[in-house]
UniProtKB/Swiss-Prot annotation:
Its cofactor is a divalent metal cation. One of its GO terms (molecular function) is metal ion binding. The lineage of its organism: Bacteria, Bacillati, Bacillota, Bacilli, Lactobacillales. It catalyses: NAD(+) + ATP = ADP + NADP(+) + H(+). NAD(+) binds at residues 57-58, 133-134, 159, 161, 172-177. Belongs to the NAD kinase family. Its EC number is 2.7.1.23. This is NAD kinase. GO terms for cellular component: cytoplasm. Its main location: cytoplasm. NCBIfam families: PRK04885.1.
């Protein structure tokens, strides 16, 4: 969905976030040198209007988590310095094009849904997180046994390695490698995908991905105490005695700068997984 922020006559505060690779540092250096002398821009990692991520999708995920509490004020734009990145609109040789587009920017943005996660521990503490791609729960040393509850109704008893819940944009990441479907981000939904489920005459699960609409909630209730590995995008945590994990579509969204160079979702999918098609 395209919307617009009001930037009329406003100096844009820009944060530049780059990984440690040589080419990323070169791109960052060029952007710094241009913006520091431009009266229409102010370089600051504090309260930015625009966050420029330089690297790949992993770098953009890190940038998202750096500013996940300011999503209503921030727009992101990605520059890829390696192979094509799913969230990036510019390659490293297109820096001049990015600078020109930002100078002409009127505040237009493309918005994608994100995932909200609430993890309840046996002592009553609740750990909350946001994910741009997905959140997974696994039990490494033993089979994970958990009830899957949708809108307070028990759907199935799961046995296997774990569960992944992804956003529409995250549907092209780990979810796809698990055999999940690719969802267009205008479909505000969550996707639950099983990780190596056990299915036989005794234990049964649906065995396919489930698409959950925005108004619905997913709950995962582990049936055994122990240590669980929980991944939120590119961050992994070891949590002991998890009693419940809840998943929702967040009220906030991630916003990307919309410009003539913004690549449509299906173009990104094609470039990432199919490439050029012979006519």
């Amino acid at each position: 969905m395209m919307t617009q922020m009001n930037y009329t006559g406003k100096v844009k505060r820009v944060a530049i976030i780059a990984n440690g690779k040589y080419q990323s540092k070169r791109v960052a250096s060029k952007l710094f040198s241009v913006f520091k002398d431009d009266p229409d821009f102010y370089l600051s990692k504090k309260n930015p209007d625009i966050v420029i991520s330089i690297g790949g999708d992993g770098m953009l995920l890190s940038a998202f988590h750096m500013y996940e509490k300011e999503l209503d004020k921030v727009r992101f734009v990605g520059i890829h310095t390696g192979h094509l990145g799913f969230y990036t609109d510019y390659r490293d040789f297109e820096v001049d094009k990015l600078i020109d587009n930002l100078r002409k920017d009127k505040g237009e943005q493309i918005s994608y849904p994100i995932l909200k996660v609430a993890i309840t521990l046996d002592d009553g503490r609740v750990v909350k997180a946001r994910a741009l791609n997905e959140a997974t729960v696994k039990r490494i040393e033993k089979t994970m046994v958990a009830d899957v509850i949708i809108n307070h109704v028990k759907f199935e008893s799961f046995r296997g390695d774990g569960i992944s819940v992804s956003t529409p944009t995250g549907s092209t990441a780990y979810n796809k490698s698990l055999g999940g479907a690719v969802l267009h981000p205008t479909i505000e939904a969550l996707q639950l995908t099983e990780i190596s489920s056990l299915n036989n005459r005794v234990f049964r699960t649906l065995g396919s991905s489930i698409i959950i609409p925005k108004k619905d909630k997913i709950e995962l209730v582990p049936k055994r105490l122990g240590i669980y590995t929980i991944s939120i995008d590119n961050k992994t945590y070891q949590l002991k005695n998890v009693t419940k994990v809840e998943y929702f579509i967040d009220d906030e969204k991630i916003h990307f700068v919309s410009s003539p160079s913004h690549t449509s979702f299906w173009e990104r999918v094609k470039d990432a997984f199919i490439g050029e098609i012979d006519s």
